[in-house]
């Protein structure tokens, strides 16, 4: 049966009618339906939950004549199951009992009180501590895309206007959202195929006017001019859909979402999706974090600092003034060793950014308040440390930290030192904070003394030495005696419970005291919850300032971390230049040098206006790819304000970094390895500029030798002569080493190796000039290819080389043609239809002539 079919509700029991009605309202997610101590799932939800969570699938009688599939989880274990579900992109609606079973006629009143989706998480137990948790929305216009992201756990709201699919793909790669909303007519689904949490939304949710009204209401402004986004129409439509979705799922005010910013690609170095993937910035090729740039650079003290660092890595700055401000701050922290004390102080702050989001949503727990109190207690100490520093950026961050003496004192008075996890059972508000609460608690807490006195008195009165007075949650207070002595109890003892060897009684006096104590406990708990709610009202007026404190602390953490990494890993401060070029002395790969079992061989690189392209040759396993990647990573690190693994680095203006390194089949899109390679190459050739850094590795491998050589030659020629980009072009086509002889600005470099008999030693050192050979057979031998195969390969290689010397490049006269002649592209021939079109004057054509001309153009094309 389909559980959202509510046409025949009368066939079902009252409880199942209630369930089916709620399920119809939340048909696109699992419904956790609270029944006593369990959350139950029925019908298809039960089957899916059983499959996803590995829980038992049973049946609950019949309703409407059919057995009801059912699965359940204990309420106290729900967070663990929710974590599993959101990790695989599943959303859950949580339906609680809000009525009293004792007074309910028919099914207990229930209500969906919480919706958990991957992109709207704020609960600490469900979030990845050191990763942003982004909800995204994308809207496709006639030209371009609108893209919006929101981190509900911090309030960070960002939009971007993107002109092409490639730009959207790069943004998806950069932001890596855990949940994506898209419109019904979205036409680029191939870009979303590997994302788990995809949600198709109706077209009307992207309506422009509705979106503007939603955003104005959220920010409390008359217009959006102050945010500088009024012309970002498509992304505002995406932002409106996203905002509505968050309101629907959170079902509460969202005061921490109080601003929206626009991501402009012109402010940062553009990294396309392939580049982010190939450089393994925050995610390795296997999808993990090990052996990535972030893993090496991240020794931050706080989770919010770690998340900010990863955002910086994906958004290298172009503005040298901003970079220099960061560098100056890092340099001062390093020289004064202030980074050491700052690290310890920041570590004690905790994740204030996410705590403030939970406070805004009123879902914060007692320990969140305790952590906030601890952070505010540390502020004076942190301010004192910063007072010794004079770098302008550090001073600015110190001012943003702010001061919160009233909030600190409030939390000190209100919250106990070590509060429980939940407010549910009380014990959170400190004694002395509220006189009425202390009075009610006094009645309850005095029960222990009273019970001791009552037990002694009753033992003496009855003569039963083993008599005990106790309490449990089910039966309340009781007097317990053994079965054998039950004949001796006084007449005013009323039997309350019979056990195997014991009888339990209550007296009118004890009953009266029980009611008094339980009443005081209930009143104390109710008052404590009221005081707890009031704490939110007292703290939230400073929400914006506390959010600024969190952001400033996170940035201080990143800068302090850069200083520590520079000291620990031997990094130097890169120099920024206004002249185009990249000069690195003794550069090292930041990741490889950390994981290598042998000392890393440092290498230089020099690129400038007169030396724009390096043809990189050398043996397989010689280190060409490592060398190229380290140049890109050092350049990127310099543009986030980080020191770099080199003796010296001088970096000029960079607008984009492109990489065409490695490839594999894109099965989901039906593209072969060669097609992927050519697509990435086309993107580079179309978009690279004279200020771009381009890494091209082994272009043309996936096709025939001459096809591949032709493509590699032409791509290198185009980059060198038409684009003028700073390029490292690695190849095994030795014909390309002739390029420096044919065009200015192109130079050969190679990675060296030493051959001795049948063995080879890789030197990993970059030398000027072209390599002499590729050593492919020696590498094959190292890989364990059988000796017979290697021997046969040597024989075949000798045959091929002999034939090539005789045949390759021979023309009709038997002379060898120059390689540039062989590979030169033919002059383009203009299409006859285009020539005809150029001669047409449309203003002089009659309708009949225009129609005849259309047929002629069709024939010519």
From Swiss-Prot:
Keywords: ATP-binding, DNA damage, DNA repair, DNA-binding, Nucleotide-binding. ATP binds at residues 618-625. It holds the Pfam family MutS_I. InterPro entries: DNA_mismatch_repair_MutS (IPR005748), DNA_mismatch_repair_MutS-lik_N (IPR007695), DNA_mismatch_repair_MutS/MSH (IPR017261), DNA_mismatch_repair_MutS_C (IPR000432), DNA_mismatch_repair_MutS_clamp (IPR007861), DNA_mismatch_repair_MutS_core (IPR007696), DNA_mismatch_repair_MutS_N (IPR016151), DNA_mismatch_repair_MutS_sf (IPR036187). SUPFAM superfamilies: DNA repair protein MutS, domain I, DNA repair protein MutS, domain II, DNA repair protein MutS, domain III, P-loop containing nucleoside triphosphate hydrolases. One of its GO terms (cellular component) is cytosol. One of its GO terms (biological process) is mismatch repair. The keyword DNA repair applies. GO terms for molecular function: ATP binding; ATP-dependent DNA damage sensor activity; damaged DNA binding; mismatched DNA binding. HAMAP family: MutS. This protein is involved in the repair of mismatches in DNA. It is possible that it carries out the mismatch recognition step. This protein has a weak ATPase activity. Belongs to the DNA mismatch repair MutS family. This is DNA mismatch repair protein MutS. It comes from Shewanella sp. (strain ANA-3). The gene is mutS.
